[in-house]
Amino acid sequence: MARPVKLYNHAVAPNPRRVRIFAAEKGIELPLEEVDILAGQSRTPEFFLKNTSGGVPVLELDDGSYLSESVAICRYLEGLHPEPNLLGRDLREQAEIERWNRRMELELFAAIGRTIQNTSPIFQGRFKQFPDYGEAQRTVVYQRLERMDRELNGHQFVAGDRFTIADITALVAIDIGGRLADIKIAPELAYLTRWHERVSSRPSAKA
């Protein structure tokens, strides 16, 4: 099986961070090559040969091929390094973790992304912004955080009682929301606050 050579990365973007945290949890050292996506480095003809969607992360393998999309990369890394397991050990657990990861992606991560894209100065001039829509999405984010707080009642982690990719997805989403859209966890959301403190304190969160 082809082995990783390096990860095309952006230090701030949340999806490369998902892969970095996943790899760090497994003790995998991935050499990083920084790609300045804001300067358009991921949208050159040369980079499109690595990833036709023109984004990061991209994992380069030693057979000369490239793998894009953060969850796809994580699945590949899990196949190479099964432990510690982050995607599920059996069919039932895999389905449960996938369910929660998709919820974090579609209900939280996506809404935070739409908030950032339509309200953050970093995207002014890059996309047509719709500030009212962005603020409406901010409301959706806060509603989802309230529900996440209820879902964490009685659980240490998003998909149950151990750290998985679902926690990684939620962490990077909330953190980028705080960094670029001033999204904060309300102090009264005690379960969510404790979860965020718990996962942020893991060494991998600094990857």
Positions of the model-derived regions?
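GST-like domain detector, emphasizing the conserved glutathione-binding G-site
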Residues: 1-131, 135
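GST-like fold's C-terminal all-alpha helical module
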Residues: 104-198
